[in-house]
Curated annotation (Swiss-Prot):
Displays hemagglutinating activity from pH 5 to 8, but is inactive beyond these pHs. GO terms for cellular component: cytoplasm. Half the hemagglutinating activity is maintained by heating at 50 degrees Celsius for 3 hours. Is inactive by heating at 60 degrees Celsius for 10 minutes. This is Lectin MVL. GO terms for biological process: regulation of defense response to virus. A carbohydrate 2 binds at residues 71-75, 79, 95-103. Each monomer contains 2 structurally homologous domains with high sequence similarity connected by a short five-amino acid residue linker. Intriguingly, a water-filled channel is observed between the 2 monomers. The lineage of its organism: Bacteria, Bacillati, Cyanobacteriota, Cyanophyceae, Oscillatoriophycideae.
């Protein structure tokens, strides 16, 4: 199965030992595998860990949740942008969405498979 690597924010990491301890947990939260690589991107404030993700997640379990999607102005826009927004979370767009603050923020429903 095809995979790719991304850097995921991990908060400040103070040592390689700490990164090796928390990296696998962060990766698991994103359905991925920690590669062992990490770097500090803002001194004393933010580090990132490298995670390998599968292009398509498989499994028998599903979990649906709402995620922020920025302002969406119509169903047509939501249906067009929803799949890409969901993909950025490693999930699939269910087609459901709603506005939570008029003119400011909408949410889309996504489905994780694992």
């Amino acid at each position: 199965m095809a995979s790719y690597k991304v850097n995921i924010p991990a908060g400040p990491l103070w040592s390689n030992a700490e990164a090796q301890q928390v990296g696998p947990k962060i990766a698991a939260a994103h359905q991925g595998n920690f590669t062992g690589q990490w770097t500090t991107v803002v001194e004393s404030a933010m580090s990132v860990v490298e995670v390998e993700l599968q292009v398509e997640n498989t499994g028998i379990h599903e979990f649906k949740t709402d995620v922020l999607a920025g302002p969406l102005w119509s169903n047509d826009e939501a249906q067009k942008l929803g799949p890409q927004i969901a993909a950025s979370y490693g999930a699939e767009f269910t087609g459901q969405w709603r506005t939570i603050v008029e003119g400011v923020m909408s949410v889309i429903q996504i489905k994780y498979t694992f």
